[in-house]
Design a protein with these regions (language model features):
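Mature catalytic domains of secreted/periplasmic carbohydrate-active enzymes
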Residues: 1-133
């Protein structure tokens, strides 16, 4: 199981897509709907969360902006599946789960809003899903 995280916008998507097609030339990333178990299996998330980097969160805090650039406003969670329907790759585009996991000691507001409520629960769901499917 591989998880890809923290790449934003169209240019970085195209770079990723070109690279992953070299690994899986016959597989397409499929958008995961909100109803997918990965968003509900342990923690029932209220939506498909967009976790900004710490810097982007601080810069956009007063306006409620969670994206890092204008072409990255919509979060995408995609999966690449094997022939038996098992997810091999989880793609987290236009979001930064890693910052939600690693920046908890740097800003109490960021920790409460993004780490506790979104990044940790989704991370636990991803690990649980990967280990049980």
């Amino acid at each position: 199981f591989m998880m890809v995280d923290d790449f934003w916008g169209e240019a970085e998507w195209h770079d990723f897509y070109g690279a992953i097609k070299q690994v899986f030339p016959d597989r397409e990333p499929v958008e995961l709907p909100y109803e997918h178990p990965i968003f509900h299996c342990v923690y029932d998330l209220p939506n498909k969360p967009q976790i900004p980097s710490l810097g982007a969160a601080q810069a956009g805090r007063s306006r409620g902006i969670t994206w890092e650039r204008s072409d990255a406003q919509e979060v995408h969670y995609k999966g690449i599946f094997d022939d038996k329907g098992r997810m091999m790759v989880m793609v987290c585009h236009n979001t930064d789960l890693g910052d939600g996991w690693e920046r908890e000691g740097q800003d109490p507001w960021y920790f409460k809003e993004f780490s506790e409520k979104l990044a940790y629960p989704l991370g636990i769901n991803i690990v649980f899903y990967a280990m049980t499917h």
